[in-house]
């Protein structure tokens, strides 16, 4: 009887941990959608533009969407383009933070590119009953 009880408790714990992991993966997609809406409202981006998000870590998983590209843009010499570097999420107690570094990619020559950072967006999520809820965002610039 005790073995069955322990088995059921461990099974519930595993299911809860799996749901929590899946919930964290959805947070990246949620933060990307919120960033896209903020950029549209501020007129930094048009609806026909591509949002270039470079993943800073291989463990980050995001859905493929038409408006988002995870590759560096193709530029001519002298051109520049805004890109956003997505960092891994950080946990601070009952809060989670997702950082997007705002960068400018500059094509200086055929083989030389330069990335200049100009600030970041930070999205905050709170934990309530083992689920994450969007709290607020902050925009930092240089």
What residues fall within each predicted segment?
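Short beta-strand edge/turn micro-motifs at domain boundaries
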Residues: 120-141
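Bacterial Sec-dependent N-terminal signal peptides
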Residues: 1-28
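Surface-exposed acidic loop/strand-edge motifs in secreted or periplasmic proteins
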Residues: 21-118
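Extracellular/secretory pathway and lumenal proteins
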Residues: 16-18, 37, 124
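Compositionally biased, low-structure terminal segments
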Residues: 6, 14, 73, 122-125
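Hydrophobic side chains in beta-strands
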Residues: 10, 100, 126-127
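N-terminal soluble segments of membrane proteins
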Residues: 19-20, 140-142
């Amino acid at each position: 009887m005790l073995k069955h009880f322990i088995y059921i408790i461990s099974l519930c714990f595993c299911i809860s941990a799996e749901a929590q992991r899946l919930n964290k993966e959805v947070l990246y997609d949620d933060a990307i959608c919120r960033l896209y809406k903020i950029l549209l409202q501020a007129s930094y981006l048009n609806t026909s533009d591509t949002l270039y998000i470079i993943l800073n870590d291989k463990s980050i998983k995001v859905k493929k969407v038409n408006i988002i590209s995870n590759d560096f843009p193709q530029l001519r010499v002298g051109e520049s383009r805004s890109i956003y570097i997505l960092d891994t999420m950080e946990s601070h107690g009952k809060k989670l933070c997702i950082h997007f570094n705002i960068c400018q990619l500059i094509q200086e020559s055929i083989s030389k590119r330069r990335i200049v950072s100009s600030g970041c967006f930070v999205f905050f999520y709170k934990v309530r009953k083992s689920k994450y809820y969007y709290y607020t965002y902050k925009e930092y610039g240089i």
